[in-house]
Amino acid sequence: MTFSILSIFVFGLISSSVALGPAPVLLGKAENFAILSETGVSNVPDSSVNCDIGVSPIGASGVTGFSLTGDSGGSFSTSKQVTGRVYASTYGDPTPASLTTAVFDMENAYKDAQERIDPDFTNLHTGALGGAILVPGLYKFTTGVSITADLVLTGGPTDTYIFQIAGTLSLAAGVKINLVGGLLPANVVWAVADSVTVAATSSFQGILLGKTQVVVNTNASVEGRILAQTAVVLQKATVIVPGVCGA
């Protein structure tokens, strides 16, 4: 009976024409990047990133493992592992100013997401979300969150989720976050105060707003964006921004 009631409730949410969940978190110029980091992006090749990478205030020395080729104009680099461009604060104008704005917007987005009030759910399942089926809303966790089995997020294309996580976030090896009902990765925001680990062969979905380090391990994927206030580490990983890069 519990499953039947849940199924009816979820169906009602998905079929509703009214957007459910909190007001969207605005990324500003940070939305131009698949990966944006303040202290560097390191990579064990080959990884694949289908949009731009940016690092600031650290310079180009903070981008490793991509075999960068500088543009003749000096404002960006390219890599065979990156479909877009790689920008660093030490490159030529207008890159430094553009990155400063993007980082400012990233920090504001994190602050906005973490400071939302009146959560719909607090410490759901004590942070153990493996196997759960969730509905749109604001989720607050005063400790860490672990996902050890597939997680299902339901909703339509205008519905939203915000996860406020005071500790770490970990996705176990081989585990998937599945979005159903037309829910978009761009509308799922994970604001994490501690480190994020996406284990080998797992599949993560959503916008990662990390206060500290984000690690994406071997053959794992992130469909969304990684916006970190310290370092991003890729190990033969894939980062996919759905749709048009920067949009």
UniProtKB/Swiss-Prot annotation:
The keyword Ubl conjugation does not apply. InterPro entries: Ice-bd_prot. It is found in: Secreted. Glycans are attached at N219. GO terms for cellular component: extracellular region. Residues 1-19 form the signal peptide. The keyword rRNA processing does not apply. Binds ice crystals and most probably inhibits their growth in order to prevent cell damage from extracellular ice. This is Ice-binding protein. It comes from Flammulina populicola. The lineage of its organism: Eukaryota, Fungi, Dikarya, Basidiomycota, Agaricomycotina.
